[in-house]
Amino acid sequence: MQIETKLLSGALGAEIKGIDLTDVSDENFNKINSLLLEHKVIFFRDQPLTAEQHIALAEKFGPLETHAYVKGLENYPEIVRIIKAEDEKNQWGENWHSDVSYNFKPTKAVILKSIKIPPVGVETCFSNMELAWETLDKKIKDKIKDKKAVHSSLGAEFFLENYKKMEGNKKKKL
């Protein structure tokens, strides 16, 4: 089957059709990885992945991580289920947040599998920080380029240099 790519916005995002994620060949993984690096966020519909297939796909991107605060599945600690019962009051990620941004080395990819999505109240947004930096006014860039930010979750410091180290990143000069 031919791989189809549908752009979802000007800044980032593409829907990919024509790849079966249940058993990804090296050739198809290289295509997926290239599309991820190009579009920053990619979506695949109707992919009935088992936990084993989910892990196998994720491992192609590199060593897997476990969440620092949320326990994963018993046999698959790298997989975190986000479930909310109808009577549950707490909201997962209700306020703006950035997943695992406290890591010293940025996470290359996250694979989300949606099983049942409520009709309202579960918006997930993505941002292209590379494009944000590229389009930032030069005066602001000059003012902040040597600054650092401290993420209060674990006190990890994030330097612009860390982004340059991210595997597969071709834009080494920011």
Annotated model-derived regions:
Residues M1-L174:
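Non-heme Fe(II) oxygenase catalytic core, chiefly the N-lobe of the double-stranded beta-helix
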